[in-house]
């Protein structure tokens, strides 16, 4: 890997598939942009299952690690295409939300940590990855996450890229909703 001013690049290769992840945070913006490029270096077509994963905080690190009775009931998400919106407490007392999106249509997704990782599992060996697909879970309460699953076929020598964005957005109080219960995403 290598790091520069505001960016990092990670590279790896296994079984004839090269992967490059380029990560940067634009100056002045509350977001991170990632580009994952996969290249098939073999002479035959290859089919891959690619998963992304972020674990959303609940906006207060001290409460996240101590106020469990509250945390088990507050997680809230909205999914639109390949965008997963983390809107915990947006209706009640927040004017901000987070979004994790991709520029490629998903095969499946998860927004519940228990569904993606497994009830007693973790990011080291997520249940969804072991199963080869997500379950399209919608988090209601504890542990909202953003996980995408892409089923990708690469021809011999072909390269494909997926762009991911993780952002934080604030809306003025009077412009919070586009419709009842639907966050304003403009």
Spans of features found by a protein language model:
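Short beta-strand and strand-turn-strand segments in soluble, beta-rich domains
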Residues: 17, 63-69, 138-148
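Conserved catalytic alpha/beta cores of large enzymes that bind or transform nucleotide phosphates
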Residues: 1-20
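Short acidic/polar mixed-charge low-complexity motifs
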Residues: 15-17, 44, 158
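Short Pro-Gly-centered flexible turn/kink motifs
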Residues: 46, 152-170
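Beta-strand-rich interaction surfaces with strong enrichment in secreted/lumenal proteins
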Residues: 10, 21-24, 136-139, 149-154
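Polysaccharide-binding surfaces and accessory modules of carbohydrate-active proteins
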Residues: 8-11, 24-131, 173-186
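Short alpha-helical segments and helix-capping/turn motifs at coil-helix boundaries
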Residues: 20-22, 32-35, 84, 145-153
């Amino acid at each position: 890997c290598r790091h520069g001013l505001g960016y990092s690049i990670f590279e790896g290769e296994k079984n004839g598939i090269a992967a490059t992840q380029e990560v940067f945070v634009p100056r002045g913006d509350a977001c991170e942009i990632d580009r994952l490029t996969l290249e098939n270096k073999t002479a035959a077509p290859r089919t891959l299952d690619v998963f992304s994963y972020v674990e959303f905080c609940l906006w207060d690190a001290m409460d996240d690690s101590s106020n469990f009775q509250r945390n088990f009931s507050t997680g809230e998400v909205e999914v639109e295409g390949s965008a997963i919106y983390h809107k915990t407490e947006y209706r009640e007392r927040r004017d901000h939300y987070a979004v994790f999106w991709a520029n490629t249509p998903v095969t499946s997704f998860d927004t519940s940590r228990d569904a993606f990782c497994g009830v007693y599992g973790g990011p080291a060996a997520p249940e969804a990855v072991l199963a080869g697909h997500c379950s399209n879970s919608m988090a209601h309460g504890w542990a909202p996450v953003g996980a995408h699953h892409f089923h990708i076929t690469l021809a011999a020598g072909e390269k494909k890229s997926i762009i991911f964005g993780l952002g934080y957005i604030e809306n003025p109080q009077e412009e919070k909703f586009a419709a009842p219960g639907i966050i304003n995403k403009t």
